[in-house]
């Protein structure tokens, strides 16, 4: 984007980061994963509930199966500064509206975590939502409107934002 085309309302920002651990069962395993998630993010986790029963996985409807944390603002940026160097991002991880997700196979890859045989190893999923100012117009209840296509985030905009902000290389 050239100097003449720059406008502060086109400057992307991180709306939220959702960190999710799917354990598939409740009990001790879920409690361990919640503790790990809270250590990594510095925020209290919320349990996720199964939406439907699945005999293949041995899960009943309404049963807790995982935990998640939603980070916003400065805490989301701080988390991404530690999580993005751990993983390799590819352009296929981005959707058409500029959001992206990635997985971390082992929680021990985070600098603050060490392997504990009592706990084991858990993986986690990270989903990042990138928006431009004014996006609330679409989400609000009263007088909601569509965001013009010229103001929507694209894959190229999101990749450029992530590469410049977090000094990370996104592979093609």
Curated annotation (Swiss-Prot):
Keyword Ribosomal protein: yes
Protein encoded by which gene: rpl5
One Pfam family here: Ribosomal_L5
One record GO biological process: translation
Quaternary context: Part of the 50S ribosomal subunit; contacts the 5S rRNA and probably tRNA. Forms a bridge to the 30S subunit in the 70S ribosome.
GO molecular function: rRNA binding; structural constituent of ribosome; tRNA binding
Protein name: Large ribosomal subunit protein uL5
Function summary: This is one of the proteins that bind and probably mediate the attachment of the 5S RNA into the large ribosomal subunit, where it forms part of the central protuberance. In the 70S ribosome it contacts protein S13 of the 30S subunit (bridge B1b), connecting the 2 subunits; this bridge is implicated in subunit movement. May contact the P site tRNA; the 5S rRNA and some of its associated proteins might help stabilize positioning of ribosome-bound tRNAs.
């Amino acid at each position: 984007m050239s100097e003449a085309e720059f406008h502060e309302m086109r400057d992307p920002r991180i709306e939220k980061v959702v960190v999710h651990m799917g354990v598939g069962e409740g009990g001790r395993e879920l409690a361990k994963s919640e503790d790990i998630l809270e250590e990594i993010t510095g925020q209290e986790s919320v349990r996720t509930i199964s939406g439907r029963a699945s005999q293949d996985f041995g899960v009943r409807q309404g049963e807790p199966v995982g935990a998640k944390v939603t980070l916003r603002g400065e805490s989301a940026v701080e988390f991404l500064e530690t999580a993005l160097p751990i993983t390799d991002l590819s352009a296929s991880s981005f959707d058409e509206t500029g959001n992206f997700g990635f997985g971390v196979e082992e929680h021990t890859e985070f600098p603050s975590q060490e392997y504990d045989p009592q706990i084991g190893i858990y993986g986690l999923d990270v989903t990042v939502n990138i928006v431009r100012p004014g996006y609330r117009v679409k989400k609000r209840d009263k007088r909601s409107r569509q965001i013009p296509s010229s103001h929507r985030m694209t894959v190229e905009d999101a990749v450029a934002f992530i590469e410049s902000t977090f000094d990370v290389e996104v592979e093609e």
